[in-house]
Amino acid sequence: SVVITPTGFSKESDWLQYGGDEGGSRYSKLNQINTLNVKDLEVAWTYKTGHLDRIPEQLSFLRKLVGFQVTPIILPDDVGGNLVFCTPFNEVIALNAATGQQVWFYDPKIDLRPFAGRFNCRGLAQWRNPEKTLSEVCSHSLYLAASDKRLIALDAKTGVPCPEFGSQGIVNVLPYIKNIEPTNQIKAMQLKSPP
């Protein structure tokens, strides 16, 4: 990972959403890195998620079904300014964007056995609750659409599930999608993209 830390980050320069902005444009106006100087970049830090190491030996075949396609996002400075992302097994990790040090880790403990599909998590969504002060739990939340058909809300500062969301931070989406056609494909359906 390469980190460039110009002074005075503004909302326009931060990658706050999965697609960069609320419209998903995947475009940045920043011009600090260009075709002339990109060759001069140096690695600031690296981070290993270790998600493949957590696959039990009896499920080693799953290593072939894992794709790392996440788009990390940056949290606003007032909730830590961390770089947050999810692993293919839906673990959520917050890293100090300047140092690469892990700030917090959340494991939703998805069951790896019943899935026929490939494992992936493409990103997270974030939301600030205008009715809460920044000191309150889940005043700024991250949302994860987990492979096992759960929607999970986490406090962006701590990674702890939001107690007011669903049942202790978790909503089982399966009852809401049972009428999807064709109904015989529901078991194969997985959530991978940000909500």
Locations of the language-model features?
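Aromatic-anchored glycine-rich loop motif in surface-exposed flexible loops
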Residues: V92-L95, Q101-Q102
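Repeat-blade elements of multi-bladed beta-propeller folds
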Residues: W15-G19, R63-E91, A116-R150, I186-P195
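Flexible loop/turn segments at secondary-structure boundaries
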Residues: G24-S25, V92-I93, I152
